[in-house]
């Protein structure tokens, strides 16, 4: 029963979060993202847990990104620099591989969360659209059973070039 409830809640959270992104006008057509370091600002004041508002503190992460648009579709690789400077193959927690589909970029990574007072492995899905000014607007959906899904909106802004000591995978090779 509780697994069914969690799956239903997760489906609802992803659907509602994604729907919010999909109804927001995006760019005219997909193109490679600008290479650089982005500040992802998560708005904790709008966080929901299991679909219920549960405000928390806001926070940010710096993610270094590279992208390419080969004939098979646009791909961006990212590395959460709060983990360290070296990009490691997924499923490393800091590694992100975004794929573009209909002007929406989506990546899922595994991540460690605190759930019911203990550390659990779960997943985080980041989904965003690129606005005309280059800003990303999207949601983070965190799933860690047996706890309910957590959805937090974010914006991301390019803050500079990728630091020379930060390694980000070639998006043409993932």
Task: Pin down the residues of each PLM region.
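Predominantly extracellular/secreted and cell-surface proteins with exposed
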Residues: 56-124
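Flexible, membrane-facing loop/turn or short amphipathic-helix motifs
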Residues: 45-54, 114-119, 143-151
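C-terminal region of N-terminal signal peptides and the immediate post-cleavage residues
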Residues: 2-10, 18-39
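A short, structured loop/turn motif at beta-sheet edges
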Residues: 31-37, 66-73, 97-104, 128-136, ...
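Tryptophan-anchored aromatic micro-motifs
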Residues: 31-54, 78-83, 136-138, 166, ...
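Edge beta-strand at a domain terminus
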Residues: 140-174
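Internal, hydrophobic beta-strand segments that form the core of beta-sheet-rich folds
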Residues: 122-144, 153
């Amino acid at each position: 029963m509780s697994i069914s409830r969690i799956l239903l809640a997760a489906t609802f959270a992803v659907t509602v979060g994604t729907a919010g992104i999909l109804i927001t006008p995006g760019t005219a057509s997909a193109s490679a993202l600008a290479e650089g370091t982005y500040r992802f600002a998560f708005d904790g004041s709008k966080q929901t847990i299991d679909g219920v508002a549960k405000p928390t503190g806001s926070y940010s992460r710096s993610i270094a990104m590279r992208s390419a648009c080969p004939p098979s579709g646009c791909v961006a690789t990212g590395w959460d620099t709060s983990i360290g400077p070296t990009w490691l193959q997924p499923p490393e927690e800091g590694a992100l591989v975004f794929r573009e589909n209909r002007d929406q970029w989506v990546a899922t990574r595994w991540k460690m969360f605190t759930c019911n007072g203990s550390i659990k492995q779960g997943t985080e899905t980041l989904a965003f659209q690129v606005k005309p000014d280059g800003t990303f607007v999207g949601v983070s959906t965190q799933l860690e059973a047996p706890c309910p899904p957590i959805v937090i909106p974010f914006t991301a802004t390019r803050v500079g070039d990728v630091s020379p000591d930060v390694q980000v995978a070639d998006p043409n090779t993932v």
